[in-house]
Amino acid sequence: PIKSSAASDVYKRQIIYRKYLLPAKCQHPKKVGRYIKMKLTILGTGNAKVTKCYNTCFALNEDKEYFMIDGGGGNTILKQLEDAGISWKEISTIFVTHKHIDHLLGIIWMLRMYCQGMARGQFGGEVTIYGHDEVISLLKQMAEMLLTPKETKFIGDKVHLEEVKDGEDRTILGHRVTFFDILSTKAKQFGFSMEYAEGKKLTCCGDEPYNECEQKYAQNSTWLLHEAFCLFSQADKFKPYEKHHSTVKDACELAQKLEAENLILYHTEDKNISRRKELYTEEGRQYYKGNLWIPDDLETYKL
């Protein structure tokens, strides 16, 4: 995903750590020895109003089974999956962090694909969608209002809309996943932490600034996913704090404090998108000494 010929000095360190990166189309890694097979595909990297990239969402997978987190704001989720080489039929589990439209509405399209595929005899699998009570209630209401009776009859049968509570565990992709309330003041929102290998965990803090209640999940994460609305140097322009968001500086200081091995920044503005990787890395390196990743849409990381 990163072309060394275009890399500037300020983010060449990312090239050094390119062992973590795989092309988005690489779906069949070699099963060698005790290598960790888990991969992370970033389907979208932008905030709610971006037009030059897709809204923030991503997928985790081992082999051909996928766990998708959020769906962005529309049917572009179908294009992102297609461009990433992921079939919607391979996504067996979804988690929706909260009800904001840039995270939720893509899930309605996924529901349509599953239910319509079942109604037409084109999909024989099952899918589980997790979320807190507000998300699950809203998805049920929207499905009843927007989908046909032939489609909605599969909800509760082969399409499971399952509520999770703060601190609850589920087994997803064969691994323990713990969901937690980030105590948002805007809209109820959950994050999660996955123990994907012995001594390895990935933690998603949602799309708002870290709250101290998340420490027991986020501390010492192998991979930490955190929002960064904009550069700290451009905070006056983008006003992240008024929107209850972080800057690159804030997120990197946090990751340093939490001793995260790798930090992925997402949910960004798109006005700097042509130089985002360079500019965000340059600012972040001043505050975080671990492996800093500023993904573009469709980049894939081997965990």
Report the location of each language-model feature.
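Short, Lys/Arg-enriched N-terminal segments with co-localized hydrophobic residues
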Residues: 18-19, 23-37
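Single conserved hydrophobic/aromatic residue that forms the stacking wall/gate
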Residues: 1-14
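Active-site metal-binding motif and surrounding structural segment of the metallo-beta-lactamase
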Residues: 75-127
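Active-site neighborhood of phospho(di)ester-bond hydrolases with catalytic His/Asp-centered motifs
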Residues: 68-72, 91-102, 106, 132, ...
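Cap/insert and terminal regions of metallo-dependent hydrolase folds
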Residues: 209-298
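Active-site-proximal loop/helix segment associated with metal-binding centers of metalloenzymes
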Residues: 50-52, 163-233
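Metallo-beta-lactamase
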Residues: 123-188, 197, 297
